[in-house]
Amino acid sequence: IDTLLWLGRAYFYSGSFLNSKDSYLEYQSMGQDHPKFADSLYELSKVLIELDENVQAKLLLDKMLTEYPGHTLSSKASALLQNL
């Protein structure tokens, strides 16, 4: 399952945003119990912003901040949300 997360990251940094989105969505479909699930919400929101899917990105960031308020990426997610 971690492979999908890393694949999503690799696609993102190579500019293959649609492939990145697909990898993150497949990763997330495997369940919220994985320790990196909150990370994937934040990272997928960045992909969606690149694809001009800002409404969906906002929803993911809101979900992340609501369900994982103490997460290490919460401040970055909050800042990203404010800039949308």
What are these regions (language model features)?
Residues 29-36, 65-77:
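Short solvent-exposed coil/turn linkers within tandem alpha-helical repeat scaffolds
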